[in-house]
Amino acid sequence: MKHTNRKTAGRNGKRPAGRRVLYLALTLGLGGAGVAALAPDPVEASQVTIYKSPTCGCCTKWVSYLERQGFETEVVSTTDLASVHAENGVPHALGSCHTAVVEGYVLEGHVPAAEIKRLLSERPAVVGLAVPGMPAGSPGMEGLVRQSYDVLAFQKDGASVVFAHR
């Protein structure tokens, strides 16, 4: 059954062509832009699974930081991070207090959201990113003191290169 709005319908029961065009333009043009503006950035909506010690406070701060940056998180508490490192190809020298996995990449330590987004956007052929050593001023390690630090991209063989300097 066809429904028409009597207030806007012409004699033949249809909307006048001008109004139909305006309606379509507003619906597809402005409405589409509005919907696109509300949709989350696909990178920001990525699911990050974090493996961390149940007692680690800085890890919890890093998780909160990621959520504020638009990432969805799932936290898995573990007392055996060494096994998590081994299963995910994290070189011993780069090991930190938590390991995360996002879209097939591994994140080790306090990796900034901007570098995660860049990783997911550029999709380099690496295992993942690491911020070894828990540097002061990195996400989750905020405080009065701030150290400069490197975000390293690492390979399966343990080789790493500077991905970003902060």
Residue ranges and their predicted role:
Residues M1-S46, G137-R166:
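Secretory/periplasmic and organellar redox-cofactor proteins
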Residues T55, W62, S77-D80, P112-I116:
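Stable alpha-helical elements in mature extracytoplasmic
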Residues G57, A82, S138:
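Flexible, glycine-rich phosphate/dinucleotide-binding loops
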Residues E87, A93-R166:
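Thiol/selenol-based redox catalytic cores and closely related redox-interacting motifs
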Residues V63-V102:
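N-terminal, post-signal-peptide region of Sec/Tat-exported proteins
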Residues Y23, A45-S46, G70-T73, T79-D80, ...:
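N-terminal start-of-chain detector that recognizes signal peptides
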Residues D41-Q69:
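Local sequence-structure signature of Cys/Sec-based thiol-disulfide redox active-site neighborhoods
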